[in-house]
Curated annotation (Swiss-Prot):
NCBIfam families membership: rpmI_bact
Keywords, sorted A to Z: Ribonucleoprotein, Ribosomal protein
HAMAP family, A to Z: Ribosomal_bL35
Entry-linked Pfam families: Ribosomal_L35p (PF01632)
Protein name as it appears in the record: Large ribosomal subunit protein bL35
Record-linked Gene3D superfamilies: 4.10.410.60
Family: Belongs to the bacterial ribosomal protein bL35 family.
Gene Ontology biological process terms from the UniProt entry: translation
Any GO CC annotation of this UniProt entry: cytosolic large ribosomal subunit
């Protein structure tokens, strides 16, 4: 049986750590001038994949 291929789009979007899968943050790419500083601060921290989506992301990454 051949090896499972990694979904390349998923490989570019997710980073796997010891027990969590890190993802990029939405609402931080453009049109930032009209967004309040408080909202930008709240969006600043690390973002992780929700536990309901972890199995699907792991399958895409071949982990």
């Amino acid at each position: 049986m051949p090896k499972m291929k990694t979904v390349r789009g998923a490989a570019k979007r997710f980073k796997v750590g010891k027990n969590k899968i890190k993802r990029g943050s939405a609402f931080r790419s453009h049109i930032l001038t009209k967004k309040p500083s408080k909202r930008m601060r709240d969006l600043r921290g690390p973002q992780y994949v929700d536990s309901t989506n972890v199995p699907a992301v792991r399958k895409m990454l071949g982990v």
